[in-house]
Amino acid sequence: MTLRAGVLAVQGDVSEHGDAIERAAAAHDRTAEVVEIREAGLVPDCDVLLLPGGESTTISRLIHREGIAEEIESHVEAGKPVLATCAGLIVSATDAQDDRVDTLNVIDVSVERNAFGRQRDSFEAPLDVTGLNESFPAVFIRAPVIDYVGEDVEVLATWDDRPVAVRDGPVVGTSFHPELTEDPRIHDLAFFDSVES
């Protein structure tokens, strides 16, 4: 069975997320059809969604203007999986701590933007992630940090005692960029565990 994976293609590592979902699918003897989402009308036909990084205020403005935001919210309400990374996490949160970001309210967290510093302060760290047998090589680039977690949200990983990966129902959010490694396990955790269970 082919998994139809929509990647929000407004900003961020679109092709890298596509490659990661294809690697994760191959590990399950499946294929993935990657659909780049730039306009409304494509999300309803997707099995899973990826919301990449970029600039959260720009992403928020564009998805609301193009009518994509409502489709993402409906996707989540239908219980379909989403992986939201870095700015995607910020846009998905209930509170972005920035009035310029009109959030989707699909992950019950409050997120502080750029909490781990500027681009020059970017780093890689091995993370212990719930559901993974070995540590994950997480890449943090001007990463946000989660400073409030709702009671129904599962914390999957922390760094420096602060949540950096969470699951809220069908949505997995990460402060880091899992697509910038050759390791597809975060995509696997977000999609195939949910899709096949």
UniProtKB/Swiss-Prot annotation:
Binding site for L-glutamine: G54, E55, S56, R113, I141, R142
Ranges in coiled-coil conformation: none
Keyword Lyase among UniProt keywords: yes
Enzyme Commission no: 4.3.3.6, 3.5.1.2
InterPro entries: Class_I_gatase-like, PdxT/SNO, PdxT/SNO_CS
Keywords: Glutamine amidotransferase, Hydrolase, Lyase, Pyridoxal phosphate
PROSITE patterns referenced in this protein's UniProt entry, alphabetically: PDXT_SNO_1, PDXT_SNO_2
Protein name, entry field: Pyridoxal 5'-phosphate synthase subunit PdxT
Taxonomic lineage: Archaea, Methanobacteriati, Methanobacteriota, Stenosarchaea group, Halobacteria
Pfam families: SNO
